Every structure is written in structure tokens, then in C-alpha cells.
Swiss-Prot record:
This is Acetyl-coenzyme A carboxylase carboxyl transferase subunit beta. It is an enzyme of class 2 (transferase). Acetyl-CoA carboxylase is a heterohexamer composed of biotin carboxyl carrier protein (AccB), biotin carboxylase (AccC) and two subunits each of ACCase subunit alpha (AccA) and ACCase subunit beta (AccD). Transmembrane segments: none annotated. Binds 1 zinc ion per subunit. Residues 23-292 form the CoA carboxyltransferase N-terminal domain. Component of the acetyl coenzyme A carboxylase (ACC) complex. Biotin carboxylase (BC) catalyzes the carboxylation of biotin on its carrier protein (BCCP) and then the CO(2) group is transferred by the transcarboxylase to acetyl-CoA to form malonyl-CoA. Residues 284-304 are annotated as: Disordered. InterPro entries: AcCoA_carboxyl_beta, Acetyl_CoA_COase_Trfase_b_su, ClpP/crotonase-like_dom_sf, COA_CT_N, Znf-ACC. One of its GO terms (molecular function) is zinc ion binding. It holds the Pfam family Carboxyl_trans. It is found in: Cytoplasm. Keywords: ATP-binding, Cytoplasm, Fatty acid biosynthesis, Fatty acid metabolism, Lipid biosynthesis, Lipid metabolism, Metal-binding, Nucleotide-binding, Transferase, Zinc, Zinc-finger. The lineage of its organism: Bacteria, Pseudomonadati, Pseudomonadota, Gammaproteobacteria, Enterobacterales. The gene is accD.
Length: 304
């Protein structure tokens, strides 16, 4: 028996450990392998490169509003395939698939609650539901959010993440642009704040309507914001676009948005802004939401 065979005979193979699916994930930006539970505590922000990953509508609203204060609005509204639309797949089949995948009936979730004790109405897009596209139910739920804010005499916050109008609903989808914008005019008449938070991506008919009509338009870092996408624009104008075109950092340089706020700092920032606008006491910055870790941006860690 050769020396290699003698060594091999003394080696006992170890049993391969089985790791449950979904425990680990990878950052789309830097490629870092991340522990899923830690990433959720960091509000889907990569602790290595500060990349803001896409966040579900419900997780976003639950991380924003005070625990125990959330009441969902418009959950009874469901999309209908009135046009019997079909492209490569029937619209009703696309809806059923999206509903099964996300657990949502449509792409916008609306809740009322409190933010640091202040009554607010908040809406958030579920991008995983047909790209967060805006159809008649999205428009109806947004109007319901406006009506609730008017009834409660409180601010409205909307987190947009959408590819634009839903082509399967044709004109009924495009009509939501005017419908939602008209509803916001009532907020302005009443003097109630409407804050629009633009997340990645905010495009098409959503960016061309209520997403850019906030009293303050706030964006998350490196969010893609615009009407047509960069590739479509380059093909149309036949020119190379400047670096960072349509990203939030590019837009704030051009004065198209008001500020960029990191997601872990968003809750306190929104509460502070709304407290000033509503003439209410400033929120306590030393009272972080239970269970939520506020990681510093890379390069800004404390020296402790």
C-alpha cells in the first residue's frame, strides 16, 4: 500500500452540513455574502458598501410606523381584468402569479398609524408585484390614503418604487396619473404636508405624477428616478448619457429633488420634518425603534 493510500484510509469524511435556504444572501452591488437576519435588521442596507436593496412594502411601513399603531386601508380593493388583456400571457394570470408570489392583492399598500406618536398616513409600493406598476387599484388606494389624511388632518407619506403605468390596463392606468394628482391638490388646499420618498426605481407614470408632487421630494441613495430609462433615452437621442444620469445624486445636483436620506435615518428625519411642519414637539432622537439597528454609513463609523 502506498503512503498516499495509507493517508486516505485514515481520513474520515465529514457529513456535509445542510444550510436552510434563505439564510444567506449576496449584495447586488459589492458581492458580499450577508446573513439574511442581520440584513433585515439593517433595513435591507448592505453593511459593507451601504447599497440600499429593494424592500417590501409591508416591511417598509412596519419599520416606519410605531409598533401597534398600524391599520391597513383599502385592502378590500382588488384588480379586475376588464379589458380581457393578453400579451404573451393573460393579465388575469399575471395578477394571480404576482399575488401568489408577494401575498399582496396589488402593488400599493396603505396604512395609517403614528410616527413618533404623530398621526400619519403612509403608502408604499411593492415592486415585486408586476414591477410596482400603477393600475386602477393603486390609484384608488392612493386616493383612499389622501382622503384618510384629510379626514384625520394629518400628513401623508408615500414611498415610490415603480416601473410606471401598468400597460395591461391601458387608458385606465394612465387615468390614475390625473386622478392621484387631483387628489393631492386637496392636501395642498388644506395645508397638510405630503412627503414623497423616491426609492429605486421610480419611473414612468408614477414619477410623472404623484411621486414628484411632494412638498418635499426625498430620495434614497443611488435610486434610479426618471421617466424613460437610460437605455431608451440613449437609443432615442443617439448620445452617451453622463455618468450617474437619473440617479438621486445626479438629480439633487440639478435641483430636481430636495434631499437624499439613508434608509436607517429616514424614520427620524421624516418625524423631525413633519414635527416642524405641523408645529409639534421634535421627536426624541434617543428613542430608536425597538429591534431596528441604525448602522453608520461606511467611512462614518464612530471611533469608539
Amino acid at each position: 500500500m502506498s503512503w498516499i493510500e495509507r493517508i486516505k484510509s485514515n481520513i474520515t469524511p465529514t457529513r456535509k452540513a445542510s444550510i436552510p435556504e434563505g439564510v444567506w444572501t449576496k449584495c447586488d452591488s459589492c458581492g458580499q455574502v450577508l446573513y439574511r437576519a442581520e440584513l433585515e435588521r439593517n433595513l435591507e442596507v448592505c453593511p459593507k458598501c451601504d447599497h440600499h436593496m429593494r424592500m417590501s412594502a409591508r416591511n417598509r411601513l412596519h419599520s416606519l410606523l410605531d409598533e401597534g399603531s398600524l391599520v391597513e386601508l383599502g385592502s378590500e380593493l382588488e384588480p379586475k381584468d376588464v379589458l380581457k388583456f393578453r400579451d404573451s400571457k393573460k393579465y388575469k394570470d399575471r395578477l394571480a402569479s404576482a399575488q401568489k408570489e408577494t401575498g399582496e392583492k396589488d402593488a400599493l399598500v396603505v396604512m395609517k398609524g403614528t410616527l413618533h406618536g404623530m398621526p400619519v398616513v403612509a403608502a408604499a409600493f411593492e415592486f415585486a408585484f408586476m414591477g410596482g406598476s400603477m393600475g386602477s387599484v393603486v390609484g384608488a388606494r392612493f386616493v383612499r390614503a389622501v382622503e384618510q389624511a384629510l379626514e384625520d388632518n394629518c400628513p401623508l407619506i408615500c414611498f415610490s418604487a415603480s416601473g410606471g403605468a401598468r400597460m395591461q390596463e391601458a387608458l385606465m392606468s394612465l387615468m390614475q396619473m390625473a386622478k392621484t394628482s387631483a387628489a393631492l391638490a386637496k392636501m395642498q388646499e388644506r395645508g397638510l404636508p405630503y412627503i414623497s420618498v423616491l426609492t429605486d426605481p421610480t419611473m414612468g407614470g408614477v414619477s410623472a405624477s404623484f411621486a414628484m408632487l411632494g412638498d418635499l421630494n426625498i430620495a434614497e441613495p443611488k435610486a434610479l428616478i426618471g421617466f424613460a430609462g437610460p437605455r431608451v433615452i440613449e437609443q432615442t437621442v443617439r448620445e452617451k448619457l453622463p455618468p450617474g444620469f437619473q440617479r438621486s445624486e445626479f438629480l439633487i445636483e440639478k435641483g430636481a429633488i430636495d434631499m437624499i436620506v439613508r434608509r436607517p435615518e429616514m424614520r427620524l428625519k421624516l418625524a423631525s420634518i413633519l414635527a416642524k411642519l405641523m408645529n409639534l414637539p421634535a421627536p426624541n432622537p434617543d428613542a430608536p425603534r425597538e429591534g431596528v439597528v441604525v448602522p453608520p454609513a461606511p467611512g462614518q463609523e464612530s471611533e469608539a
